[in-house]
Curated annotation (Swiss-Prot):
Phosphotyrosine sites (modified residues): Y4, Y15, Y19, Y77
Reactions mediated catalytically: L-seryl-[protein] + ATP = O-phospho-L-seryl-[protein] + ADP + H(+); L-threonyl-[protein] + ATP = O-phospho-L-threonyl-[protein] + ADP + H(+); [DNA-directed RNA polymerase] + ATP = phospho-[DNA-directed RNA polymerase] + ADP + H(+)
GO biological process, one term: rhythmic process
Name of the protein this chain belongs to: Cyclin-dependent kinase 1
Amino acid sequence: MEDYTKIEKIGEGTYGVVYKGRHKTTGQVVTMKKIRLESEEEGVPSTAIREISLLKELRHPNIVSLQDVLMQDSRLYLIFEFLSMDLKKYLDSIPPGQYMDSSLVKSYLYQILQGIVFCHSRRVLHRDLKPQNLLIDDKGTIKLADFGLARAFGIPIRVYTHEVVTLWYRSPEVLLGSARYSTPVDIWSIGTIFAELATKKPLFHGDSEIDQLFRIFRALGTPNNEVWPEVESLQDYKNTFPKWKPGSLASHVKNLDENGLDLLSKMLIYDPAKRISGKMALNHPYFNDLDNQIKKM
């Protein structure tokens, strides 16, 4: 830690306090995440350290790079590249009645998908994607932060400040207690974020797991074994769930064209096996008119 100085506290992350810092010799500005673990006495589990070390290998223009992993007084500090703005803050800063430019929505979605495809190809899931951990710079680049941390540390139910971890972007298979899940969980989250890029509003903003599920069911219909084989045998599926009929996504997401709505609907397919993959999403006609500069990134 002697290589870095803390400049200021910039927030509370899922796992602990987040600081803006500076490398003493190079002057590089960094983000320092202090990881606060449940069992402080035992120090950092070796499995977590192994997982985290692997994340240093994830180098991609749309992934926030993990530059260093440091220990101090049995506390773990993760040193990341610094970006000052997250997607949530940016969406909140757009004046009422105005929306993000549709070409920027497209560019951001494409970049998010490029980042996710890169990680999925290396068998790393995110599991906790949300606008707060999508960081943007002033050149139009968006980067995914906190990759792989869920696997290293688990996803707490509450942040250590007792703020509840958001459920709005969580996939139905996770909400229904599926023990086995894979890369489609991240695609679902990106779908909900896509809708929010277009409308500035969370697509499904539940305040409990059951409220979250019911908001999804009201919009997309209550799933059954016909549309999603074996869903009825998932741990938290109840035959007593109200049977809503599928509605139209277009009524919830006003600012997307036909191609955008088609891609969104494929990202929000209930059955994870039928949900579009990141790779297939990148080749969807929605991106046909995207600037080639972005495609080459």
